[in-house]
Amino acid sequence: MTNFREILKEKRAWYKTIGKVYCPILKEYIIFNSRGFYHLRYDTHEKERLVKEQIYKFNLLPLVIPVIKNATKIFDYKKQEYSKPLGKYYEIWELREIMGEKSPTEVSVILRKIGTGNITFLSVYDRKIKTKKPPKSR
């Protein structure tokens, strides 16, 4: 298995190439800055995430762009709230899309706008979709 430092270096290099992606549902460009990548590695309280969790989030990164480009609705929106640590108001959007055919996964992309700045990528996670199995015949 490739060691974590190599994975981190590879994913960071790929992330830096993104720059910005247009989001039709928000009618704005989403900026991929260093804060978004930092949040994949550290939680809200600045504590480093477990390596397993970081790799999990890194592996979801390629799905972020299709979710942003193809989202047909905003799943959740948190209106402007004041953040003492940021010293500014912020807004949060959650976009969700189902990705994959064989084993569909619902991918959530979290976007944030601080003050009057740009909307930026903040995080990503997924949820396996449970498919109903036919009842067993007796």
Which ranges hold each PLM region?
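Ribonuclease/tRNase effector modules and their secretory precursors
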Residues: M1-R138
